[in-house]
């Protein structure tokens, strides 16, 4: 019988091409052998005694083999190779056990003799004593066999051995298939699981498998494939022109050290697996990364003979749907283990803390009022926003950038009272700046049918010489692709004392809808000046882009000029719009609609794209009137104003407002709508130890680090175009202890010093006043954490990052709202190099190299050309705003006064005593 079973097992192994048979296959062999050897011929002739004898014989063989099996399993657990004979013994023993089990539990209970014995036992027939004794013995043997089967400990080990061996055989088969596959092939979730399992059990000296997750850090931290060797490479951190060196030095600059070390050993792994989600942009970047690793690995070439690179079929969603979907892990640190000091203390970037995003800009409301709700349900193109919102909820990770520079400062805890004097001194964020490109938000383009290519940048540029791409850009000859490098911003300007208090963020009742008869060109049939007490979009108002979208060419005349109707004291808005549209880079992206792909519906402080959409519509209307209009009819910006009022009630009414506040509001609002990190939570403040170490660094390096931290929560084209940074340093005059905070700005408000009777005031005087060391009054003295009491102290502001476009607000109003009308002389070409922090002493935080901190354009000199002036006449509440804007070499300077505009005969007229907000563009080579 034994040889017969062995022969059958071997035949089945050959048929299934496997060294091991499954439990089901071995059970089938046992059933076949019972029919072949035991119940042949007439089953009725088989007696109970013969079957029990057969079981006892097989059981004795089973017990004998079990001793050998214990040694075999013990050797396997120690990692020893198992011979074919040992495998056969184990499989044979399982068949023996199964034969006994089937006979005892199935065949014998069906015998008529067994049924009679059970009946006799139950009735206790004393008339057949001899028969009863014989039956009693048979029943005892049967019960003993049954009990032996139930208590046998070996069968569980045998089953476990067979199952694990089958699994390992499958893993080996999957791995053999992978070994035969070429780099760039797709592997299934089954094959990946086999590789992961094989790697965990491998005794090989070669590292087996490295997984690269190509999603945002936030999504990676939420969940990723559970394996030891895995890194996150954010899709926005690299581009097609990168090499493997760039990936290591730029893309992974803010990654945890453990991940950087794994990537540095990439050429030592047997398999590298790339995976991402279903997002179109991420899938494209996955192919880009594959190409970099295969064709541009110059520092550590990857050989297909030694390391194979595969792509996970169906990506992470497919893994979740597979049988292995439960094998995922989360990387969110517990609140008790957050270490945010990393970069300052030891250069470690792994302690990233993700918290809830606070309100960064007081001018953008958390919740929208009723009129904005009307805009969200408007019947025309605004429903694109709703579609975008639905799709972006599925692809939310694209909007979340959790740069590892957060990790550089993972220890931002709640503000320390000892380290802060007031809200003015709370850490916000800062940097050295050039121009990183904003992260692309690959949501569907809401402007359907627009086939124009998008020139909006795709990835942040982290190299030092990124500035050189702008060296040849002249304002009159702007290359439309010149802003392929873009950096971020979200901030409050240092506002004039009269306007530092922001209106409370309360919900306003729904305003009365006002139907305005708008013609196809967006002109109002109302008079030039409309003065409703409040305005609201009616449900009949539409946002159809078809009448304002340009046709086919990208060669826009960015120096178009169109007047704007005054909607009732809205000159404050008109003058800022005219000046801002003098910023060619900004005008370009709203004309070619590339901005639309970057709207972040999930930005916590944004308007869900409302403000950006209405601003774009206004730009289109103005451009269309310039191109098509014969009479140059002024445009009514009423819908744009309604959108502004829906976001901030300060601009809902027809009352006069401060134009610099509107400028701040507009840029903040556009930033939040386009903020690709608007869903990211912020970091906590530094621990006292980390802050102490930061104080020892130069402003140049500390501000650069703080700027990178800022970019993890605020990253948009607005940031790149307008964002700067200054440092505010408090110093104790007793112990010389300092505390420095870094504040981003969009509009830089500078004070006007008292006029010297002998000399005129220059804008350089204003900057000197802004950056001078100030002795704090007794009631303002700093609570020095070193002295642990209020001490005589000083405060000094230093500009640490100068933006590409600098907006300067001359603080003409004092705390009593009195206006300073002194003439501040400002040049057409302004050199701010002397006011830029240039104190680098060669010292970096421990573990951080000089090539790890991006310069982002912060290379002197810093020279700026004037291109816009917003002027104010009268008082704060009863004045009027106009604007001077430079419109290229052909048109020169134009003067805008609401609906009217005219050329300026003498450009020196743009330098006047009514200047209130100045717009400068950085220039090179002058």
Curated annotation (Swiss-Prot):
Transmembrane segments: none annotated. Its EC number is 3.4.19.12. The active site is at 571 (nucleophile), 880 (proton acceptor). One of its GO terms (biological process) is proteolysis. Residues 205-328 form the Rhodanese domain. Keywords: Cytoplasm, Endosome, Hydrolase, Membrane, Phosphoprotein, Protease, Thiol protease, Ubl conjugation pathway. Its main location: cytoplasm. One of its GO terms (cellular component) is late endosome membrane. It catalyses: Thiol-dependent hydrolysis of ester, thioester, amide, peptide and isopeptide bonds formed by the C-terminal Gly of ubiquitin (a 76-residue protein attached to proteins as an intracellular targeting signal). SUPFAM superfamilies: Cysteine proteinases, Rhodanese/Cell cycle control phosphatase. SMART domains: RHOD. GO terms for molecular function: cysteine-type deubiquitinase activity. RFU1 is an inhibitor of deubiquitination activity. The modification Phosphoserine is found at residue 443. It is a peripheral membrane protein. Residues 562-923 form the USP domain. It is found in: Cytoplasm; Late endosome membrane. Belongs to the peptidase C19 family. Residues 1-208 are essential for the localization to the late endosome and constitute a late endosome localization (LEL) domain. Interacts with BRO1, RFU1 and VPS32. Associates with the 26S proteasome. This is Ubiquitin carboxyl-terminal hydrolase 4. It comes from Saccharomyces cerevisiae (strain RM11-1a) (Baker's yeast).
């Amino acid at each position: 019988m034994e040889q017969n079973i062995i022969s059958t097992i071997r035949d089945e192994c050959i048929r299934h091409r496997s060294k091991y048979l499954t439990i089901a296959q071995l059970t089938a062999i046992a059933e076949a052998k019972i029919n072949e050897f035991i119940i042949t011929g007439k089953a009725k002739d088989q007696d109970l005694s013969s079957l029990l004898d057969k079981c006892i014989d097989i059981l004795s063989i089973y017990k004998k083999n079990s001793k050998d099996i214990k040694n075999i399993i013990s050797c396997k657990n120690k990692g020893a190779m198992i011979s074919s004979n040992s495998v056969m013994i184990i499989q044979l023993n399982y068949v023996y056990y199964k034969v006994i089990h089937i006979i005892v539990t199935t065949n014998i209970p069906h015998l008529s003799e067994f049924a009679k014995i059970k009946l006799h036992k139950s009735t206790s027939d004393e008339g057949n004593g001899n028969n009863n004794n014989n039956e009693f013995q048979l029943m005892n043997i049967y019960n003993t066999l049954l009990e032996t089967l139930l208590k046998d400990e070996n069968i569980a080990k045998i089953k476990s051995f067979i199952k694990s061996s089958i699994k390992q055989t499958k893993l080996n088969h999957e791995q053999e298939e992978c070994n035969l596959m070429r780099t760039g092939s797709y592997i299934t979730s089954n094959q990946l699981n086999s590789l992961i399992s094989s790697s965990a059990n491998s005794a090989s000296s070669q590292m087996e498998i490295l997984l690269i997750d190509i999603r945002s850090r936030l999504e990676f931290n939420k969940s990723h494939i559970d394996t030891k060797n895995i890194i996150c490479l954010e899709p926005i951190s690299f581009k097609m022109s990168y090499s493997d060196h760039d990936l290591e030095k730029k893309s992974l600059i803010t990654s945890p050290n453990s991940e950087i070390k794994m990537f540095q050993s990439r050429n030592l792994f047997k398999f590298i697996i790339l995976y991402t989600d279903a997002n179109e942009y991420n899938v494209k970047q996955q192919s880009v990364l594959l190409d970099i690793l295969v064709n541009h690995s110059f520092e550590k070439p990857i050989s297909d003979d030694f390391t194979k690179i595969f792509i996970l079929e169906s990506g992470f969603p497919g893994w979740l749907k597979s049988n292995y979907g439960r094998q995922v892990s989360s990387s969110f640190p517990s609140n008790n283990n957050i270490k945010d000091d990393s970069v300052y203390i030891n250069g470690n970037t792994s302690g990233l803390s993700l918290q809830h995003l606070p309100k960064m800009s007081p001018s953008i409301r958390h919740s929208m009022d009723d009129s904005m709700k009307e805009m969200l349900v408007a019947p025309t193109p605004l429903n694109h926003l709703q579609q975008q919102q639905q799709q972006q909820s599925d692809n939310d990770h694209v909007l979340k950038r959790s740069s590892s520079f957060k990790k550089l400062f993972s220890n931002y805890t709640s503000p320390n009272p000892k380290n802060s004097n007031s809200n003015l001194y709370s850490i916000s964020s800062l940097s050295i700046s050039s121009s990183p490109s904003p992260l692309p938000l690959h949501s569907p383009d809401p402007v359907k049918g627009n086939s124009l290519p998008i020139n909006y940048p795709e990835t942040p540029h982290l190299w030092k010489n990124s500035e050189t791409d702008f060296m040849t850009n002249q304002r009159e000859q702007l290359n439309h692709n010149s802003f392929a490098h873009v950096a971020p911003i979200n901030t409050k300007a240092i506002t004039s004392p009269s306007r530092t208090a922001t209106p409370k963020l309360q919900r306003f009742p729904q305003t009365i809808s006002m139907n305005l008869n708008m013609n196809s060109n967006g002109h109002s049939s109302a008079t030039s000046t409309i003065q409703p007490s409040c305005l609201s979009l009616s449900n009949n108002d539409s946002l159809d882009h078809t009448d304002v979208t340009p046709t086919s060419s990208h060669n826009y005349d960015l120096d178009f000029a169109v007047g704007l109707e005054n909607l009732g004291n809205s000159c404050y808005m008109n003058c800022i719009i005219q000046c801002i549209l003098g910023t060619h880079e900004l005008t370009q992206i709203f004309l070619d609609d590339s901005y639309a792909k970057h709207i972040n519906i999930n930005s916590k402080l944004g308007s869900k794209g409302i403000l950006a959409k209405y601003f774009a519509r206004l730009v289109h209307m103005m451009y269309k009137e310039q191109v098509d209009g014969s009479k140059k009819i002024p445009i009514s910006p009423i819908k744009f104003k309604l959108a502004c009022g829906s976001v901030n009630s300060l601009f809902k009414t027809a009352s006069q407002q401060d134009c610099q506040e509107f400028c701040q509001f507009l840029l903040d609002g556009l930033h939040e709508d386009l903020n690709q990190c608007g869903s990211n939570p912020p970091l906590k403040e530094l621990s006292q130890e980390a802050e102490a170490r930061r104080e020892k660094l130069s402003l140049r390096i500390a501000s650069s680090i703080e700027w990178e931290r800022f970019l993890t929560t605020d990253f948009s084209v607005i940031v790149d175009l307008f964002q700067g940074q200054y440092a505010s340093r408090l110093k104790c005059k007793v112990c010389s202890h300092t505390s420095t905070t870094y504040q981003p700005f969009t509009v830089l408000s500078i004070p006007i010093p008292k006029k010297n009777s002998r000399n005129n005031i220059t804008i350089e005087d204003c900057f000197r006043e802004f950056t001078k060391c100030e002795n704090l009054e007794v009631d303002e003295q700093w609570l020095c954490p070193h002295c642990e009491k209020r001490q005589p102290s000083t405060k000094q502001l230093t500009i640490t990052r100068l933006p590409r476009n600098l907006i300067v607000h001359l603080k003409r109003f004092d705390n009593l709202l009195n206006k300073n009308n002194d003439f501040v002389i400002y040049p057409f070409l302004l050199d701010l190099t002397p006011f830029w922090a240039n104190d680098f002493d060669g010292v970096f935080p421990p573990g951080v190299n000089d090539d790890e901190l991006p310069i982002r354009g912060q290379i002197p000199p810093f020279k700026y050309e004037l291109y816009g002036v917003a002027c104010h006449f009268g008082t704060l509440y009863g004045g009027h705003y106009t604007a001077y804007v430079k419109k290229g070499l052909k048109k020169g300077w134009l003067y805008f006064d609401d609906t009217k505009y005219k050329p300026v005969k003498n450009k020196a007229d743009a330098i006047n005593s009514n200047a209130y907000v100045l717009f400068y563009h950085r220039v090179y080579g002058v």
